[in-house]
Amino acid sequence: MLKMGVVLFTFLVLFPLATLQLDADQPVERYAENKQDLNPNERMKMIMSALGQRRCCISPACHEECYCCQ
């Protein structure tokens, strides 16, 4: 009876745990790698926003993504 319990425990508990794929085993999808096909302006905007910096804009074109140079 003990041997049957060990066999059942092995196949019902340990075997599924061993075959379960954990989150750490998954490949990482990087945002920048997925965005390689962006044009340079969109890429620069993404990099600047990630760095927390804003670009300098000429006075009539100032908006929330940049600050006025003059």
Swiss-Prot record:
Summarize tissue expression: Expressed by the venom duct.
**Which stretches of the sequence are propeptide?**
25-55
Q: Which Pfam families match?
A: Conotoxin
Q: What keywords appear on the UniProt entry? A: Cleavage on pair of basic residues, Disulfide bond, Secreted, Signal, Toxin
A molecular function GO annotation: ion channel inhibitor activity
Residues annotated as signal peptide: 1-24
Is the keyword Flavoprotein assigned to this protein? no
Cystine residue pairs: 56-68, 57-66, 62-69
The UniProt family comment states:
Belongs to the conotoxin M superfamily.
Q: Which GO CC annotations does the UniProt entry carry?
A: extracellular region
Question: Subcellular location, in the record's words?
Answer: Secreted
Q: What is known of its domains?
A: The cysteine framework is III (CC-C-C-CC). Classified in the M-1 branch, since 1 residue stands between the fourth and the fifth cysteine residues.
Fetch the InterPro entries from UniProt: Conotoxin
This protein's name:
Conotoxin Lp3.2
Question: What's the superkingdom here?
Answer: Eukaryota
Origin species? Conus leopardus
